[in-house]
Each structure stands twice: as structure tokens, then as C-alpha cells.
Amino acid sequence: MFITYGRGGFVIKSNKDKSVARASAESEIHSMSNATSRGAYELDFGKSQQHLKENDQCHLYEDNQAVIHMANNGRSYSDKTRHIKIHHYFVKQHLDNGEFTLSHCPTQEMIADILTKPIQGSQFIKLRNRLLGYEEVFPNLVWGVWK
């Protein structure tokens, strides 16, 4: 997870999942749920310290299209996703009440991947520069969470 405020990151975290997932989408939605929880805390803290405005939103970036679909539409009742627990509506709840927005981020642009995958060459340099704030990720973005 990588949380930005302005140009640079202020929360950078990488850890091994504590649960075993049957599918990659389940693992991704677990991670998104954790990132949403941390993002909600940081958003509330920023507002309480008056560093953020009351109408500021947190932007979630995800590279898995299936997870984006599940988060936007709630739990899917297909055979492949019926085992995902209902508590993952947590993400949808934050999206629905407007605190968070969710966008697709191509795998090549996913900053959090530098923490978990063996990236080399120019891709590593590009993601490292964004992670350290040397290069703007999105010029108009104030607050973002890469999961």
C-alpha cells in the first residue's frame, strides 16, 4: 500500500497477507479493504488536523478489473466469487458515500508494485521516482491510495 499526499508518499507499507485466498480477486479485495480502512483513517485525521478540506476525497487505484467491478457493484453471486465474505461491502460503502473514488491503474503505472514485485530497469527507475516524489504521479491529485 502506498498513500500519497501532494507529490510524495507518507504511508508506504508492504506485508504478507495473513489469510489464504482461493482466487486472486479475493486476495485483491482483501487488500483493497485494508487499504480503504487505512485510507479512511488518514482522511479523517487529515480533516481533523485541517490539512484537508471536508469535501476532499481519497482516490483508490487498482490494477485488477474484476475487483473494480466487485467494489463498484457489490458482491457478485457468480460461482467464482460466492465465497467472498459480506464484510467486503466495506469498500462499496465508502465508494457509495463519496469518501472514496476508485480508478483503474495499469499494471505498468502501479506504484505499489515496486514493494512486492521484482521490477527492473527503466520501470524500476520510473516507479522509484514517483514513490519518492521526484516525479508527479497525477498533477491534480491531492490524496491517493495505491494498493
Task: Enumerate the language-model features and the residues they cover.
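RNase H-like nuclease fold core
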Residues: 1-25
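RNase H-like nuclease module associated with reverse transcription
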Residues: 18-147
